[in-house]
Regions:
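N-terminal amphipathic alpha-helix/helix-capping segment at the start of soluble metabolic enzymes
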Residues: 1-79, 84, 117-126
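Alpha/beta enzyme core
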Residues: 23-30, 63, 75-233
């Protein structure tokens, strides 16, 4: 802790000793060993979904803590794989990505249909898979903040995935279509017994006004998270 305080410098006391007085801690649904039972079990999710959630929460170094550490890799789709992996070309191999998650003690590995599908028979029983079924891509010009379906839920189910994942760019011109698409995919995933994970991003150039970037405001990012939970992420 003393090393952390040194790194934080003059901001150490403000950051390490801050206590929120607006909403008491006791009113928050905080992570814990009983998170699935305490928070999720009373929802309308099927027992198979709860089982797969428990598989995620009880795997890796953080098993039983209520926290998740996922290795997310979408390089090659939303980022140039060459720019990302050139310093370590081994990671062009999907097997190396999954092994990194295993050796790092992650709760699971989240990646594309292609990456996880290429090695599913070898690794799906060794670490929970999260198949991300929509992506942006930046070969199209001008670039747009949109998410396109790259896979369907049945493909993730057949390869043995515990969960599916998606992104919605809340606030973008395409966000309402994205919300509908992801909502329908999550519904199908729950029917098949898989958990659902959503990356809730704010994307709108109008959210930047002068030197202020409202993308990072607690109220707007909290609204994005609330919309994500509304479609049962």
């Amino acid at each position: 802790m003393s090393d952390i305080a040194k790194l934080l410098g003059d901001e150490a006391d403000k950051l390490l000793k801050h206590e929120c007085r607006g909403i008491p801690k006791a009113r928050l649904h905080l992570p814990g060993p009983d998170f699935v039972d305490r928070v999720v079990a009373s929802s309308d999710r099927k027992p198979a979904v709860l089982r797969n959630l428990a598989a995620l929460f009880n795997h890796g170094r953080l098993a039983g803590s209520g926290y998740l550490s996922l290795l997310p890799v979408d390089q090659g789709v939303e980022h140039s794989a060459g720019a990302s992996f050139a310093p370590n070309p081994d990671f062009f191999d999907p097997g190396h990505i999954v092994r990194l998650a295993i050796e790092g003690g992650c709760n699971g590995v989240a990646s594309t249909l292609g990456v996880l599908g290429a090695v599913s028979r070898k690794y799906a029983h060794k670490i929970p898979f999260v198949v991300k079924f929509n992506h942006n891509e930046f070969l199209s010009y001008p670039n747009t903040y949109d998410q396109t379906l790259f896979a369907d839920v049945e493909q993730a189910f057949e390869m043995g995935a515990c969960a599916v994942g998606a992104t919605v760019y809340f606030g973008s011109a395409e966000s309402r279509r994205q919300i509908w698409e992801v909502s329908q995919m999550f519904k199908r995933a729950h029917e098949l017994g898989m958990a659902t994970i959503l990356w809730c991003y704010l994307r709108n150039n109008a959210f930047k006004q002068g030197d202020t970037d409202y993308h990072v405001s607690a109220d707007m990012s909290g609204q994005a998270n609330h919309l994500g939970v509304t479609i049962e992420a």
